[in-house]
């Protein structure tokens, strides 16, 4: 029998925790405000990312904070990087904005590195600026650091369900900057044997078949993508494996979700499994709230100290 790994508990706890801290920050005159930037004009991505952005904004408002969503997908491609840089610089300067998310993926013609390099590291809710990213290679503290939201959310789920990572064979499918890459580094530090598979891997089946834990973070469901589609099904895994499904896309025409993991066939073999709805997505949003509170304190320290003028 499969045990479902649900994110609701983490999400509820994070909201309560964030609500308390919003009150404390208000005492020093700071209201957490999250700015989310959407740059992608691809219809699948726009539909998907709009959905995620509005859910995150709703969470922030529910705990007493504020949220703004900036959509830049109508700016002509040749000007989009420049406009995004101008927006990021203005968000960096504004004292009322305490956290920024540049929603991924950004379109291929946008200079993503330049955008993350321009973002103030203390407002970086995703821990994706060059310096924040590098810190992961040193060491991390799951409870106290601003860490990439989805990887940290997944580690919190493992902890909550008592799933051991030390010495386990873990396969991460996907090597994206948002999930696959940071998560594989974190798992390595937790003493797992980590294998990272991606579009150019020569073979995937034998690695997936022998894994104790499979984390699928691809986001190319066969219903939507013809080249390099990916879906994890029950035949591909061994009995008793732990499976975490991360990737998913909204079909812009039907509005329907399509996910990395075939829930039904995988549930027949897995010991633990995240549901496609109510699993990793909620754990991610829990972490967005926690990270926003932390960036808000970082900004509060800067803003408050800049108001103190000495003799
Ligand atoms: N810079 C950046 N930071 C991110 O954190 C980021 C990103 N880019 N790009 C896309 C992914 C994806 N992501 C999700 C957020 C919420 C749900 C979520 O709440 N899902 C609900 C269901 C959604 C629904 O009801 O439509 C659930 O799992 O139950 C899922 C996925 C954040 N991402």
From Swiss-Prot:
GO cellular component: cytosol
Known catalytic reactions: (6R)-5,10-methylene-5,6,7,8-tetrahydrofolate + NADP(+) = (6R)-5,10-methenyltetrahydrofolate + NADPH; (6R)-5,10-methenyltetrahydrofolate + H2O = (6R)-10-formyltetrahydrofolate + H(+)
Pathway of action: One-carbon metabolism; tetrahydrofolate interconversion
Record keywords, A-Z: Amino-acid biosynthesis, Histidine biosynthesis, Hydrolase, Methionine biosynthesis, Multifunctional enzyme, NADP, One-carbon metabolism, Oxidoreductase, Purine biosynthesis
Highest taxon of source: Archaea
A GO biological process held by the record: methionine biosynthetic process
Binding annotation for NADP(+): 174-176
Molecular function as annotated in GO: methenyltetrahydrofolate cyclohydrolase activity; methylenetetrahydrofolate dehydrogenase (NADP+) activity
EC number(s) recorded for this UniProt protein: 1.5.1.5, 3.5.4.9
Function: Catalyzes the oxidation of 5,10-methylenetetrahydrofolate to 5,10-methenyltetrahydrofolate and then the hydrolysis of 5,10-methenyltetrahydrofolate to 10-formyltetrahydrofolate.
Family as reported in the entry's similarity comment: Belongs to the tetrahydrofolate dehydrogenase/cyclohydrolase family.
Quaternary structure annotation from Swiss-Prot or TrEMBL: Homodimer.
Protein name: Bifunctional protein FolD
Organism name: Pyrobaculum arsenaticum (strain DSM 13514 / JCM 11321 / PZ6)
Phylogenetic lineage: Archaea, Thermoproteota, Thermoprotei, Thermoproteales, Thermoproteaceae
Gene (UniProt): folD
């Amino acid at each position: 029998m499969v045990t479902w790994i649900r994110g609701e508990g983490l999400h509820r706890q994070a909201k309560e925790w964030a609500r308390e801290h919003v009150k404390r920050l208000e005492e020093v005159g700071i209201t957490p405000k999250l700015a989310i930037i959407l740059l992608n004009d691809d219809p699948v991505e726009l539909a998907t990312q709009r959905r995620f952005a509005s859910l995150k904004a709703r969470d922030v408002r529910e705990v007493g904070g504020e949220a703004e969503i900036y959509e830049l997908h109508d700016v002509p491609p040749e000007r989009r990087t420049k406009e995004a840089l101008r927006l990021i610089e203005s968000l960096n300067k504004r004292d009322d904005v305490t956290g920024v998310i540049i929603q991924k993926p950004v379109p291929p013609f946008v200079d993503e590195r330049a955008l993350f390099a321009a973002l103030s590291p203390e407002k970086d809710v995703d821990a994706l600026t060059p310096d924040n990213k590098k810190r992961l290679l040193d060491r991390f503290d799951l409870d106290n650091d601003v860490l990439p939201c989805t990887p940290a959310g997944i580690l919190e789920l493992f902890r909550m369900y008592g799933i051991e990572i030390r010495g386990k064979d873990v396969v991460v499918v996907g090597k994206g900057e948002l999930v696959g890459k940071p998560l594989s580094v974190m798992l390595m530090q937790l003493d797992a044997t980590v294998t990272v598979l991606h579009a150019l891997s020569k073979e995937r089946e034998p690695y997936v078949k022998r894994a104790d834990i499979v984390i699928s973070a691809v986001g190319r469901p066969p219903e939507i993508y013809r080249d390099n589609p990916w879906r994890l099904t029950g035949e591909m895994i061994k009995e008793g494996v732990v499976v975490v499904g991360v990737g998913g896309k909204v079909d812009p025409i039907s509005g329907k979700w399509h996910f990395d993991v075939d829930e039904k066939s995988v549930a027949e073999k897995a010991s633990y499994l995240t549901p496609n709805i109510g699993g990793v997505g909620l754990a991610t949003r829990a972490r967005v709230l926690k990270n926003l509170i932390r960036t808000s304190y970082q900004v509060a320290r800067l803003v408050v100290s800049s108001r103190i003028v000495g003799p």
